[in-house]
Design a protein with these regions (language model features):
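Short, low-complexity disordered leader/linker segments with a strong preference
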Residues: 1-38, 62
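Short, glycine-/small- and polar/acidic-enriched structural segments
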Residues: 27-156, 163, 183, 189, ...
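Sec/Tat-exported extracytoplasmic proteins
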Residues: 56, 80, 85, 95-98, ...
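Short acidic active-site motifs
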Residues: 71-72, 168-172
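Pocket-lining segment of extracytoplasmic ligand-binding domains
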Residues: 88-90, 171-263
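Short, surface-exposed acidic
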Residues: 157-161, 268-279, 311-317
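Secondary-structure end/capping motifs
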Residues: 232-306
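Conserved C-terminal helix/tail region of periplasmic/extracytoplasmic solute-binding proteins
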Residues: 297, 301-323
C-alpha cells in the first residue's frame, strides 16, 4: 500500500490542471444523505467542483473542496471519502495501482485553450511556427494534448516551436505578458478567462479541445468522478441517487449562468464574475453508462499510445467502469 501511494503521489506532481491557485483547502460540511448513509464527496476547485454547486447547496452530501490532488488521492484510497472528482488519467493510475476505485462518469471534457495577444485566431501552421508556447501540466492531460496537436501539424518541439513548461498557470500568464506578443500560452479554464479579464489584450486564439477531437477521434477528457468499489457494493442505491442529483446539478449550472456563478463564488471556487464568463468554455458534463466506457476507453488508449506511464502502465479492465 505504501508503495502504491508513493507512486500515486509522484503522479500528482504533474497534475496541476485542476488546481486553480488557492493555497488552502476549504471544507464544506453538509448533512448526511439519508437512511444513516453519509456520502462523503471531495472535488478539486475548478470546473469539476463548479458542476457540483447545486448539490452543495442542497445539503444532502458531505462536501470538501481541495486546491491540489495530493490531498484527494490518499483520502479516496484510504476510505476517508467515498466519491472524488479527479483528473481522468489519474483515475486510471489509482485503479491500476490499487484496484479500489470505479469510474462513475466523465464530468469535464476539454478545458484547454491557446491564448495570446491580438484577436486573430490561429488558422495555420505558420501562426504557431517559430513561437514559444508557455504551458503548465507537464506529465498530464495538457502535455499529451499539446503533443498530439503539434505532431499532427508536423511541428517538432525544440525545432519548429519551443514549449516552455511552467509549474503554475500564473507563470504562463506572466511570461506571456512579458513576451510583447511574440509568444503563446496554453491555459485551462477558468484560468484563461481570469487572464483575459486581467489583461484585455489577451484572447483565446485556438480551441485545443476541438483540435484534439478532430485528430484523435475522441473528445479530450479532463476530469472524471470515481467512487470506492467497497462503497458502491455496500450502498449502490446512494450512488445511483448521487448520479441523479449530479446530473441535475450539471444541467442547472449549464442552464443558469448567473445563479450558478453566484453559488460558485459562495463556495469559494472562483469569483462569480469570472465564473459567468468562463462557464461556456468549461465543458462541464456528466457522461455515464456505455457512453462513459466508450469515450473514456478510447481516450485512455490515446494516452497509452503516447506514454503508458500516464495511465498506470496499462489499460484498465472492464470493472474500471460503472455501467
Amino acid at each position: 500500500m505504501k508503495k502504491a501511494l508513493t507512486i500515486l503521489l509522484v503522479m500528482l506532481l504533474a497534475v496541476s490542471l485542476f488546481a486553480q491557485g488557492a493555497k488552502e483547502s476549504s471544507g464544506i460540511t453538509k448533512s448526511p444523505f439519508s437512511d444513516d448513509v453519509e456520502v462523503r464527496v471531495v472535488a478539486l476547485k475548478g470546473p469539476t467542483a463548479m458542476g457540483m454547486v447545486k448539490m452543495m447547496d442542497e445539503g444532502k452530501y458531505t462536501f470538501s473542496l481541495e486546491s491540489a490532488p495530493d490531498a484527494v488521492v490518499p483520502a479516496i484510497v484510504k476510505g476517508e471519502v467515498d466519491i472524488a472528482a479527479i483528473p481522468a488519467n489519474l483515475a486510471s493510475v489509482i485503479y491500476n495501482n490499487t484496484g479500489k476505485v470505479e469510474v462513475l462518469g466523465i464530468n469535464t471534457l476539454g478545458v484547454l485553450y491557446i491564448c495570446g495577444f491580438g484577436d486573430s485566431a490561429i488558422t495555420s501552421v505558420d501562426d504557431i511556427k517559430g513561437k514559444t508556447i508557455y504551458a503548465s501540466g507537464k506529465g498530464s492531460t495538457p502535455q499529451y494534448a499539446l503533443e498530439t496537436i503539434l505532431n499532427s501539424l508536423g511541428l517538432v518541439d525544440g525545432k519548429d516551436v519551443y514549449v516552455e513548461w511552467k509549474s503554475e498557470h500564473a507563470e504562463c500568464v506572466a511570461a506571456l505578458a512579458s513576451s510583447n506578443g511574440s509568444a503563446l500560452a496554453m491555459l485551462p479554464q477558468p484560468f484563461a478567462t481570469t487572464a483575459m479579464m486581467q489583461n484585455k489584450d489577451i484572447h483565446i486564439l485556438y480551441d485545443m479541445n476541438d483540435a484534439f477531437e478532430a485528430i484523435a477521434g475522441t473528445p479530450l477528457v479532463t476530469g472524471v468522478v470515481v467512487a470506492r468499489k467497497d462503497f458502491i457494493k455496500e450502498h449502490e442505491s446512494a450512488v445511483k441517487a448521487f448520479l441523479e442529483d449530479y446530473k441535475a446539478s450539471v444541467e442547472f449550472v449549464n442552464s443558469n449562468t448567473k445563479e450558478a456563478s453566484e453559488l460558485i463564488e459562495k463556495y469559494g471556487i472562483i469569483k462569480a464574475a469570472v465564473a459567468a464568463k468562463a462557464l461556456p468554455y468549461c465543458n462541464i458534463t456528466l457522461i455515464t453508462g456505455n457512453e462513459l466506457e466508450k469515450t473514456l476507453s478510447v481516450y485512455l488508449e490515446a494516452l497509452y499510445a503516447q506514454n503508458p506511464k500516464s495511465i498506470g502502465q496499462k489499460l484498465p479492465a472492464a470493472d474500471f467502469y460503472y455501467l
